[in-house]
A protein has these predicted regions:
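Bacterial N-terminal signal peptides that target proteins for export
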Residues: 1-7
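A beta-rich soluble binding module of mature secreted/lumenal proteins
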Residues: 18-183
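Bacterial N-terminal signal peptides
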Residues: 7-15
Length: 183
C-alpha cells in the first residue's frame, strides 16, 4: 500500500509540475465532448509513459483504459496493461475522475489518492469518437487511444503527428503492442 501511495503522490507531482519549455500549458479541445459517447474501452496504442524508479508503464502491452460514468457524475476509470509482454504481469490502476470544465467536458481531474488530483486533458478527439489523445498541461505524458486495438500504420503516424503539433517531442512516443484473440 505504501508503494501505491508513493506512486500516486509522485505521479501527481510530476503531472502538475512546471513545464521545462517555453510552450504555454496544453489546452483541451474547445468543442463539447459527449460524455456518454466517450465512455467505454479505449485501447492505448501509444504513449509517452510514466517511467520512474517507483512505477512504470513503460513496455506496456495490451493497454486498455475504460471509463464508466457513475450515477453521481464521477468517471470510474480502469487502466489495465500487461508488463513486459503479452503474458506479463497484469497491472491495474483505478483512479476516479470528474469533469472539471463542464462547458466542454474535455478537461477532467483524476484522483488516485485523496487529496491529490491531476489534470487530464482531452487534447484531440476525432468526430467519430474513434481516436483520442489525452495529455497533461506540462506535456510530460501523453496517451494515444483508439476504439480498436489494431490501427494501421498510417493512422498511427497521423496521430503521432498530432501529438507533435500539440507541442510534444514525438520522438518520445512509444507504440504499445496490442494482440487480442477476442475481447
Amino acid at each position: 500500500m505504501y508503494a501505491a501511495r508513493l506512486f500516486v503522490i509522485l505521479t501527481f507531482m510530476l503531472m502538475t509540475g512546471c513545464a521545462m519549455n517555453d510552450l504555454p500549458r496544453l489546452q483541451s479541445i474547445e468543442r463539447p465532448v459527449d460524455l456518454q459517447r466517450f465512455m467505454g474501452d479505449w485501447y492505448v496504442v501509444g504513449s509517452i509513459p510514466i517511467d520512474t524508479w517507483f512505477a512504470s508503464e513503460a513496455n506496456a502491452h495490451n493497454a486498455v483504459e475504460n471509463y464508466v460514468l457513475t450515477d453521481d457524475g464521477k468517471i470510474q476509470t480502469t487502466y489495465t496493461f500487461r508488463k513486459d509482454g503479452f503474458d506479463g504481469e497484469e497491472q491495474q490502476f483505478n483512479p476516479i475522475g470528474w469533469v472539471h470544465n463542464t462547458n466542454t467536458n474535455s478537461e477532467w481531474r483524476m484522483q488516485f489518492l485523496w487529496p491529490f488530483r491531476s489534470a487530464y486533458l482531452i487534447a484531440y478527439l476525432d468526430e467519430d469518437y474513434q481516436h483520442t489523445i489525452i495529455g497533461v498541461p506540462n506535456r510530460t505524458y501523453v496517451w494515444i487511444m483508439s476504439r480498436e486495438p489494431d490501427i494501421g500504420e498510417d493512422v498511427y503516424e497521423r496521430l503521432v503527428n498530432v501529438v507533435s503539433e500539440l507541442g510534444y517531442d514525438s520522438s518520445l512516443v512509444q507504440r504499445i503492442p496490442q494482440q487480442w484473440s477476442e475481447r
